Amino acid sequence: MRKIVNEMKLRLPARSVNEAVARSCISAFVAEFDPTLEELCDIRCALSEAVTNCIVHAYKGYREDEPHYIYISVRLYDSREITMEISDNGCGIEDIETAMRPMFTTGEPSERCGMGFLVMDNFTDSLTVKSKVGRGTTVLMRKILTPEPSEGNE
């Protein structure tokens, strides 16, 4: 049975500047596992895409003067597994299967390419999306890091 060795929770306003904040926080947090550069880039890219999707899509049409947040929970397990849960209380996704198709976008095609979920899926080992219209969306990603080199084999 895997055991949680560390956990981080963030609540950030849904503002584009906070996408970089989330990336920086997760980079520092997962450093304790000493991921490879490729693994770190994968984690940062997947998280960045999930946060950006929340910022761009979750609160579209909502009042600007009301606070809107993105919730991020990251767990590190003794098995060198990392889980990242990104959620919002926004509009939700009506049809997850359709939304996950490459090139699908609810925005203007000239502004959005509809590759967000594909990017998240390709940079992680698993991707799960749950959503309720009018209640929000949760994206759960899992990344398994390469084993630590054993003593003497470095």
How would you describe each model-predicted region?
Residues 49, 53:
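Conserved polar catalytic motif of the HATPase_c/GHKL fold
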Residues 21-24, 98:
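Generic recognition of short, well-ordered alpha-helical segments
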Residues 13-14, 35, 91:
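Structured loop/turn residues at secondary-structure junctions
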Residues 9-21:
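STAS-typified acidic loop motif
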Residues 1-9, 54-154:
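Conserved beta-strand-loop-beta-strand hairpin that lines the nucleotide-binding pocket
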Residues 23-48:
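Conserved short strand/loop->alpha-helix "switch" segment adjacent to the catalytic nucleotide/phosphoryl-transfer site
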